[in-house]
């Protein structure tokens, strides 16, 4: 899938689960729950133990329509390893020089972080397909709305602090998609083995996104 189609697909999916978990086992359990909740993309942050191996495993077990993301990519060597493992898109919390070009060359997408107007514009000029507005919680939906007003042509993905309590507000403010971190996984239920609750909680984000798109 070419990068523009990847970006379009992410926009259609609307919610990107961003997994940052303390153990590989917890990450595997969370992935299983997200798949059962009918998510079609997952971003695995590289702060998760064995993240690249998990990424490779997820790529092998899912079809072409499922998008696998690598998050918290901070250097080009790691970016290439993620691409080699099958990542469809690379995500950084800040501008990583050359990462977008690496993704372009591989036909993959790059989501580059920025928060201020200058950082957002720099990420876009660097070649980001989507700008990850991070940490979104520092400014909330009002900040995103202000950024969107200045750069209406730039696809924005607020990440960091997005929850089921404010997801609708982020879409109203101009988000093309949202990245949801550990709010999407009920950690206590996961640890207790209550898969049904974890799945239902995660699925509620998809339902809210569908509601936002219908408005």
Where in the sequence are the language-model features?
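Conserved N-terminal beta1-alpha1 strand-loop-helix module at the mouth
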Residues: 1-86, 105, 153, 164-165, ...
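Glycine-rich beta-to-alpha transition loops that act as phosphate-gripper elements at the mouths
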Residues: 20-22, 48, 68-76, 92-96, ...
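Catalytic cores of alpha/beta
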Residues: 30, 75-85, 118-126, 143, ...
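Glycine-enriched alpha-helix->loop->beta-strand junction motifs that scaffold or abut catalytic
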Residues: 35-40, 62-65, 83-90, 104-111, ...
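Glycine-rich phosphate-binding active-site loops on the catalytic face of alpha/beta enzymes
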Residues: 89-102, 133-141, 175-195
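Shared catalytic-loop signature of beta/alpha-barrel
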Residues: 122, 138, 143-157
